[in-house]
Amino acid sequence: MPRQVTDIKLFLQLAHRGDATSARVKKNQNKAVKFKLRCSRYLYTLVVADAKKAEKLRQSLPPALTVTEVGKKA
């Protein structure tokens, strides 16, 4: 089941949980970046409009987490 998260700090706490298995980073055409975090029960989604914040968040994800880049289609 999907859940939308609006707070970056809460998203990072969820990413550091033990049941977080993977994350996907999706870039939209309108410059928004979606972070999708797969946990055991929910798929958490965070939408970041600022590219600099998105890059900092991408670097702040735990190294044990599998991160997949999903770009826009050419």
Curated annotation (Swiss-Prot):
One of its GO terms (cellular component) is cytosolic large ribosomal subunit. Component of the ribosome, a large ribonucleoprotein complex responsible for the synthesis of proteins in the cell. The small ribosomal subunit (SSU) binds messenger RNAs (mRNAs) and translates the encoded message by selecting cognate aminoacyl-transfer RNA (tRNA) molecules. The large subunit (LSU) contains the ribosomal catalytic site termed the peptidyl transferase center (PTC), which catalyzes the formation of peptide bonds, thereby polymerizing the amino acids delivered by tRNAs into a polypeptide chain. Its main location: cytoplasm. Keywords: Cytoplasm, Ribonucleoprotein, Ribosomal protein. It is found in: Cytoplasm. GO terms for biological process: cytoplasmic translation; protein-RNA complex assembly. Belongs to the eukaryotic ribosomal protein eL38 family. Pfam families: Ribosomal_L38e (PF01781). InterPro entries: Ribosomal_eL38 (IPR002675), Ribosomal_eL38_sf (IPR038464). The keyword Ion transport does not apply. GO terms for molecular function: structural constituent of ribosome. There are 2 genes for eL38 in S.pombe. Component of the large ribosomal subunit (LSU). Mature yeast ribosomes consist of a small (40S) and a large (60S) subunit. The 40S small subunit contains 1 molecule of ribosomal RNA (18S rRNA) and at least 33 different proteins. The large 60S subunit contains 3 rRNA molecules (25S, 5.8S and 5S rRNA) and at least 46 different proteins. It comes from Schizosaccharomyces pombe (strain 972 / ATCC 24843) (Fission yeast). This is Large ribosomal subunit protein eL38B.
